[in-house]
Amino acid sequence: TKNTIHLYIYKMIRLIILSDFTEAFAHKLLRGIMEYSRQTEPWAVCRMPPAYKVQTGIEGVLAWAGIWKADAIIGQFNDDDPIELFEKNGIVVVAQDFNSRFERITNITSDYLLTGQMAADFFLRKGFRNFAFYGYKKAVWSDERFEGFRRCLCEAGYENNIYEYNHQPL
């Protein structure tokens, strides 16, 4: 009828971002998520610092997620974090590249081999003949960037002109 009012009720997605917001990546990720939310439907987003996970463990993060009724979490997780606890509680888990990639869950990642190759190409075009790479120990993005950097320089004949420093953990 003409006087019928239609109500559309939707559930607002509640997302926790467990990331280091002192880094540009986390801010850009948040900006992209909020832009997507504006174009589709409103989301509620909780910014959670990694210190919270350090203090309370995954169990503490899960407890907060339960109180807040989170639907999903994007986070910097360690290999030994029991992330399956989120899944068991109906919370979707997405890993932000941090130390390594996860096999069982979705990862936010990049083509780090290509990034390293692009850096090496840049220095080769500038005429450099000796190269150094400053990276971090046991960080997938750093390891793969170095591998792309190294491969490109080896293909150009500079396999003996590369110094790698990766003694500092994140």
Regions found by a protein language model. Name each.
Residues 79:
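Short glycine-rich anion-binding loops that position phosphate/pyrophosphate groups of nucleotides
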Residues 1-72, 82-170:
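Bacterial carbohydrate/catabolite-sensing allosteric modules
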